[in-house]
A protein has these predicted regions:
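Bacterial N-terminal signal peptides
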Residues: 6-19
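Histidine-rich, glycine-flanked metal-binding segment
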Residues: 24-28, 32-38, 47, 53-104
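C-terminal helical cap
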Residues: 45, 360-370, 375, 380, ...
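Metal-associated gating/positioning segment near the N- to mid-region
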Residues: 85-161, 179-185, 238-244, 265
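Divalent metal-dependent hydrolysis catalytic cores, especially in the metallo-beta-lactamase
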Residues: 126-147, 164-174, 195-207, 216, ...
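C-terminal cap of metal-dependent C-N hydrolases
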Residues: 452-507
Length: 533
């Protein structure tokens, strides 16, 4: 039995953790951003908060160093601002005149991989794409660059020595050991070592039940959080109902949820020629999984939902990372690729039997239709879970499947809207709910006195059109009958430091341009040949 457990754990590590990457180029010392200031006053904004309140403005916000100290309504729309009521600026105070702009809490990406060696993405590139889209906190699930590397960058970000979001480190279960974990005692030992190393939680892919339960129990005793991608290699033994009951705090993607909803079978119905290592098999059949689950509103559907609600369980759906499965051409042709996607990352995305998430061996209409139906059921469960009081967060998992860091996160917000979330509910999922799931609700997630000064500032109203948050903006016809680009985050403020979001993206473009010049890196579509001059 011990041999069998060891073998299963080895297979999980080799097949799933095999997609984790070696260390990438470290982030340089910060030279960008102004602040923090002894006192910063942001004047005249409309606040779009995550507390359930409607927008309100004009408002002045006072920040001292990195803490929000005052939030003051200073007038009414269409009338002059009441100067007598405004916070007074003293000598040396930094004042931002943001009249007419919108301010939101800094975004939380609950599934943010810090690049990868296989993708050729240096840390600076990833961090600036995130900051360019208002992302001020990320959770790095599996911490694929290694615990030491991730913890070093976490510490540097906390000290604002690098231009980067706040980082939470969730190493992959079993990582860092030179042998598989084969007993509950070893599982508990690894969890204690993980906590001692300063990690914020654990990312699981699955394990033998006695090992998985021991690890979750020990992790819970230590007060740490956890996340799980319920890989098909182990989900047949522990789906989300079992792992949540054992102490798991967050599930990633959809894995483990339809399996918990089975009411006429106990396992996924795999074709006889299925091979997990063939990723076209893996993801094509995943697109047919939700229709094998219990129907919406059925006894099993309601039972699973109610049990997860009782456990205060968090869903982190990462809708965007599978979005290409519904429309591959759209994902490949996204506006931002030609400007912001590195040639090495573009090559990684292309059809490959080796690169993870590049399973476009023969992807066509039938696969896309199946996935569109899959999304309808998946989104229905997630939206209903939210409506019944469940916690749903926003995570992107970018760097795979034609999803680019930052841009993929905004796409996730659009997909939450498609699932049925109201615009304000989308913002809450992207901010306050992420803060709750991370155990940081006292510090981030909303614009409230005493919290960190993490903000997103932009000229356009994202409640009217989420697309204005994309770094490439959106298209609008002006009064001269001319198409123009509007939107994009203007400033990202993290820890009271003001980052010019468009400058962040300009730096990313420069990194991409250099890579193209050095490697003749024109981005060609798969199968397309470069034309000879």
């Amino acid at each position: 039995m011990k041999y069998f457990i060891t073998l299963c754990f080895f297979i999980i590590c080799s097949l799933v953790n095999g997609h984790l990457y070696s260390q990438i180029q470290q982030a340089p010392q910060r030279s960008e951003g102004d602040g923090p200031f002894e006192r910063l006053i942001i004047r005249g904004v409309t606040v779009i908060n995550s507390t359930g309140a409607p927008p309100i403005g004009p408002v002045d916000i006072v920040v001292e160093k990195n803490i929000i100290k005052q939030i003051k309504s200073v007038g009414y729309p269409g009338t002059p601002v009441m100067d007598k009521d405004r916070p007074k600026a003293g000598a040396g105070d930094k004042v931002m005149d943001c009249e007419g702009m919108y301010i939101l809490p800094g975004f939380v990406d609950m599934h943010g991989h810090i690049g990868g060696q296989s993708q050729g993405t240096p840390a600076e590139y990833v961090f600036k794409l995130w900051l360019g889209h208002g992302i001020t906190t990320i959770r790095d699930p599996a911490s694929g660059n290694g615990v030491k590397w991730t913890m070093e960058h976490k510490a540097k970000s906390l000290k604002n020595e690098i231009a980067a979001p706040r980082i939470l480190c969730y190493p992959a279960f079993g990582s860092g050991w030179d042998k598989p974990i084969s007993t509950p005692e070893e599982a508990r030992l690894w969890v204690r070592e993980n906590a001692k190393n300063g990690a914020d939680g654990i990312k699981f892919f699955g394990a033998a039940p006695e090992i998985f339960k021991a690890a979750l129990d020990e992790n819970k005793k230590l007060g740490l959080k956890s996340a799980c991608h319920h890989a098909q290699l182990e989900v047949g033994r522990m789906n989300v109902m079992a792992t949540a009951a054992a102490g798991l705090t967050t599930m990633e993607h959809w894995y483990g949820l339809p399996e918990a909803l089975f009411d006429g079978q106990t396992l996924q119905d795999y074709p006889s020629d299925y091979n997990y290592n063939n990723e076209q098999h893996r993801f094509e059949e995943a697109g047919r999984l939700w229709k094998q689950a219990a129907k919406p509103g059925s006894e099993r559907w309601n039972f699973v939902m109610n049990e997860l609600l009782k456990m205060d369980f968090t869903l982190d759906p990462t809708f965007n990372i599978y979005d290409a499965n519904r429309d591959l051409m759209r994902a490949r042709q996204a506006d931002w690729h030609k400007i912001y996607t590195l040639p090495s990352l573009w090559k990684f995305y292309a059809p490959s039997r080796i690169s993870h998430g590049s399973y476009w061996f023969d992807w066509g209409t039938e696969q896309e239709i199946a996935w569109k139906e899959n999304y309808k059921l998946w989104m229905q469960f997630v939206n209903e879970y939210k409506n019944k009081g469940g916690r749903v967060t926003a995570g992107s998992d970018s760097g795979f499947i034609y999803q680019l860091y930052g841009f993929g996160y905004i796409r996730e917000l659009e997909l939450l809207r498609e699932a049925g979330f109201l615009p304000l509910e989308v913002i809450r999922a992207a901010t306050l709910k992420g803060a709750e799931a991370l155990g940081m609700v006292d510090k981030i997630g909303s614009i409230e006195i005493g919290k960190y000064a993490d903000f997103v500032l932009l000229d356009e109203n994202p409640l009217a059109n989420i697309k204005v948050l994309y770094g490439t903006g959106t298209i609008k016809l002006n009064e001269k009958n001319e198409a123009e680009r509007i939107g994009g985050v203007k400033y990202t403020i993290k820890d009271g430091i003001i980052y010019d979001a468009k400058k962040m993206l300009a730096d990313v473009k420069a990194i991409v341009d250099r890579a193209k010049a050095e490697n003749d890196g024109e981005l060609l579509q798969p199968g397309e040949k470069k034309l000879k001059p």
